[in-house]
């Protein structure tokens, strides 16, 4: 997929964002094609989560512009935007006193007015979303009784029930063990293959390189890299993003370069060992 041959879902032009006295994002410009899978990586504090919150309108847009499907973000009403875009935050905040099914049904709110009761097809959409994320057997459990990984899957189920064209995901496999990480990654690949546009923040570069068509890397609030995974997975490029020396080896199945985690050496540590 190339941007020149595809319709543009998202266009960000010279966007900057300040939170209080701190400049979080600076001169951010990029595009995402409809049906593309873009991973967003970078060190802690680089501005990844803030970027997602700006893209969905949680934070007021500062300088520059954000356009979804050719329309400025600020022109969308909340329900209109929610029918096109689902945002899945990290499931580590305060939880409402809802059961899993009740929470997943919240994903249907863009299609309900204050005077509309939940309809059979809303429940069907919620059931299908719970089955896709393998939380259907938890339907009657309260959110507060779930593990971190289970909560993360429930948050994703609510986004799927929303039925939006775009998924904005903040660390979607956080708290999951390797088995469930693989299941969620496979689900996201299937959704992307079916036409969903996905923007996913992650700290794990290896899955990002294997799953996405392009990767955007932030460093200190600026774009340090934006391109295909094969251009990212080079020592000098990764060094510029993470200030670390990373050993790359071929993936045993695909042959693509992957990072060997135990080989990470920060520049600071190297200086200390001299």
Give a label for each model feature.
Residues 41-43:
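The feature captures the beta-strand-to-loop junction immediately N-terminal to the Walker
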Residues 56:
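Helix-to-loop junction immediately C-terminal to a conserved catalytic motif
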Residues 64-72, 81:
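Conserved ABC transporter NBD signature motif
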Residues 105, 120-138:
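Conserved ABC ATPase "signature" region
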Residues 142-146:
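Conserved ABC ATPase signature
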Residues 167-171:
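Catalytic Walker B motif of ABC-type/P-loop ATPase nucleotide-binding domains
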Residues 241-274:
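ABC ATPase nucleotide-binding domains
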């Amino acid at each position: 997929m190339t941007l020149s041959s595809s319709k543009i879902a998202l266009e960000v032009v010279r966007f900057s964002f300040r939170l209080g006295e701190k400049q979080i994002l600076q001169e951010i410009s990029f595009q995402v094609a409809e049906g593309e899978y873009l991973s967003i990586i970078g060190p802690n504090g680089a501005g990844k989560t803030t970027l997602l919150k700006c893209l969905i309108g949680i934070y007021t847009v500062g300088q520059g512009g954000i356009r979804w499907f050719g329309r400025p973000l600020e022109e969308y009403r909340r329900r209109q935007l929610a029918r096109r875009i689902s945002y899945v935050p990290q499931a580590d905040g305060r939880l409402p006193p809802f059961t899993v099914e009740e929470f997943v049904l919240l994903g249907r709110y863009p299609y309900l007015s204050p005077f509309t009761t939940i309809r059979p097809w809303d429940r069907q959409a919620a059931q299908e979303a719970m089955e896709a994320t393998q939380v259907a057997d938890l339907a009657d459990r309260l959110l507060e009784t779930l593990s971190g990984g289970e909560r993360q899957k429930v948050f994703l189920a609510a986004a799927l029930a929303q039925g939006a064209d775009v998924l904005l995901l903040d660390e979607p496999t956080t708290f999951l063990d390797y088995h469930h990480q693989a299941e969620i990654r496979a689900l996201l690949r299937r959704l992307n293959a079916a036409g969903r546009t996905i923007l996913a923040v992650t700290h794990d570069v290896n899955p990002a390189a294997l799953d996405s068509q392009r990767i955007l890397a932030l460093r200190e609030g600026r774009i340090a890299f934006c391109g295909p995974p094969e251009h990212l997975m080079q020592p000098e490029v990764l060094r510029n993003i993470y200030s670390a020396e990373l050993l790359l080896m071929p993936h045993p199945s695909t042959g693509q370069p992957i990072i060997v985690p135990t080989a990470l050496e920060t520049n600071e540590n190297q200086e200390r060992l001299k």
